Every structure is written in structure tokens, then in C-alpha cells.
Amino acid sequence: MENDFSSSACLELEDRIDVFVKKCSLEDKNFLIELERKYRLEEVVINQKEEDDKIIHFVLSKALTTQCIFCAMKIENGKLFAVAKAGTNAQGKNYFQLGGVFCREEFRNRRIAFFVIQHLLQFIHSCGKKASLFVKVKNEPAKKLYKNLGFTETGKYGISYFQKQ
């Protein structure tokens, strides 16, 4: 996958909307926890009653130590917080799989997720890997975003959920 990412384009975005994009580490967990909570409730969790802070902290800590996560951060009223994130959720021989892509609702449609993913794609390319991802069939905004980033649809997939009775 070709990626014509230029850091000057990202800096232009960062100057315009007062955010910066960074590669995250475990030290960033406290800044990311609320964004991870919103992501999991909107995109991942089937039964919201079963989700709790211990699970969110565990999943985020594991991702920050075993995967690659980039986020867009913003300072507002003297407080730093994450507005968007994108990361890998699987790393194979030839491909890194993107996952956990999420942007706070009030920051959507500003190309923030686009630039966060571009940072991630640049990192993936620097590792000599290609990128792949899955997207829900009805998630048209995400499909448009990924198409604008150069992704092409290669097939359909389904998720089966199992629950112990």
C-alpha cells in the first residue's frame, strides 16, 4: 500500500485545530482511558452492564504494551485529553491489522482520525509491513475514511458472539 503522507500536512492540521498526534506508551494510559471507554461502549461491548473499569484498564494496558497506538491529543482549559486514536490489534509476518480506531463525537468530520491513521500507517510502513483492517458493513463514515486512506475492500466478514448460558 502506497502512502503519500507528508508531515507538513499533518502539522498544518495540528496548527489549525490545536491538536497533536503522538505514538502512545503505557504512560499515556490515563489520558486515553476515557476515549477507550467510549470506544468500547460504542463499538465493542454487547452487554454494557458487563463492562467495568477493571476490564477497560486491563485491555488498554495490554494494547499499550503489546501493540502500537497513536492518538490525537488536545489541551483545553489547561487539561490534556485524547480526542482520537488508532492502533494495531494484531501483528503478523507481512501485515499489521488496524483496530481501535475511534474519535470523540464532537471532533468527528475534522480529518483528525485521518491524520492519526496516517501516522500509524507511516509507522507500519517503516516496519516493512502492510496494513489491513475490518470494518462493520453499515459503518459508512469509516468505510469512506479508509477508502480515502487508500484501502480497498477485499471481502466480507462476520462476527459470531458466543455467551455461556
Per-segment meaning from a language model:
Residues 100-103, 109-126, 143-148:
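Conserved acetyl-CoA-binding loop-helix of GNAT-fold acetyltransferases
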Residues 60-61, 66-86:
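Conserved beta-hairpin
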Residues 1-17, 160:
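Acyl-donor-binding surface of acyltransferase catalytic domains
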Residues 153-156:
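A secondary-structure capping/hinge motif
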Residues 133-147, 159-165:
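Conserved beta-strand-loop-alpha-helix junction that forms the acyl-donor binding cleft
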Residues 90-98, 108:
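A conserved beta-turn-beta hairpin within the catalytic core of GNAT-like acetyltransferases
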Residues 124-135:
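Conserved GNAT acetyl-CoA-binding A-motif
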Residues 10-49:
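Short amphipathic alpha-helix that is part of the acyltransferase structural core
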